[in-house]
Amino acid sequence: MKTSPHRNTSAIVDLKAIRNNIEKFKKHIHPNAEIWPAVKADAYGHGSVEVSKAVSDLVGGFCVSNLDEAIELRNHLVTKPILVLSGIVPEDVDIAAALNISLTAPSLEWLKLVVQEEAELSDLKIHIGVDSGMGRIGIRDVEEANQMIELADKYAINFEGIFTHFATADMADDTKFKDQQARFNKIMAGLSRKPKFVHSTNTAAALWHKEQVQAIERLGISMYGLNPSGKTLELPFEIEPALSLVSELTHIKKIAAGETVGYGATYETSEETWIGTVPIGYADGWTRQMQGFKVLVNGEFCEIVGRVCMDQMMIKLDKSYPLGTKVTLIGRDKTNEITTTDVADWRGTINYEVLCLLSDRIKRIYK
């Protein structure tokens, strides 16, 4: 989707806030651990290239979801190590090797397909993925891990790392977390040899399970200033949200009592009402679920009325405002604030999803 620079709807990204959040984490974790930020999904909607360049001096490497995300960083001269967390097709391992991109090896079957490729494998770096209870990708027993190590050694593949991912580190009940921890430790104890990087700590584990001492801390949502648990667990230190979402009023009118607003005529005025139109809609990631939620105009909460359209939405105003008046969808205006987590709670989802759904059509402004 093409960015719309001539449309005054913007995501404002505070790169200093992201740097400050990383600095706070560096003080919180083990001094020997490297932070590898997750900049997948366009850095959770913040802009992967811009974020990576802004924090490169603070981190050991970066984590992305797929090979294309890694290639994008390399194409923009990001030189730090990069780990692809998802599996890739074996036919593309030569690209990763040539660009010094480390890959997740999710299974022995996958690695067998890799060595069948007519590619130079001596520059290939792999991190064996361990499924300790997430049920997503990775091996589940030490025998398979050791067979993978043996196969990697045979073909001069660099067994650089091994890792797992916790499913419930952001929950108050740590029963599942401890079970996963025990499963991962059991596999580690039976490995034929240890790699350079052993890592299992995601953002939530770094925040609430400091007993985990890892070579790499995979820092995600809290780097961008959000609590991975939503509002369930209290953060051990303050972090600053890095993204605000703003737009403006493009049309204002007073309509009579009994008039309807939007598709389906789902909102009817009970009295004369000022209605403002805002250029953002579900094609921008501001979903139809937002009907009935609030935005901020001049520091005051204003209700979203009628169904959110593809490109625009309507809000109920307390009075007339000039065209171009700022509308805050996420962020602070005077004494009031709307957080990403507030939006997520209204939608019945998580703050991660709210950020990741903000489409490329919304221009990003960096400060």
From Swiss-Prot:
It catalyses: L-alanine = D-alanine. Substrate binds at R136, M310. Pathway: Amino-acid biosynthesis; D-alanine biosynthesis; D-alanine from L-alanine: step 1/1. This is Alanine racemase. The modification N6-(pyridoxal phosphate)lysine is found at K40. GO terms for cellular component: cytosol. It holds the Pfam family Ala_racemase_N. PROSITE patterns: ALANINE_RACEMASE. Catalyzes the interconversion of L-alanine and D-alanine. May also act on other amino acids. SUPFAM superfamilies: Alanine racemase C-terminal domain-like, PLP-binding barrel. It comes from the Bacteria. It comes from Lactococcus lactis subsp. lactis (strain IL1403). Its EC number is 5.1.1.1. It is an enzyme of class 5 (isomerase). One of its GO terms (molecular function) is pyridoxal phosphate binding. Its cofactor is pyridoxal 5'-phosphate. Keywords: Isomerase, Pyridoxal phosphate. GO terms for biological process: D-alanine biosynthetic process; peptidoglycan biosynthetic process. The active site is at K40 (proton acceptor), Y263 (proton acceptor). The keyword Isomerase applies. Belongs to the alanine racemase family.
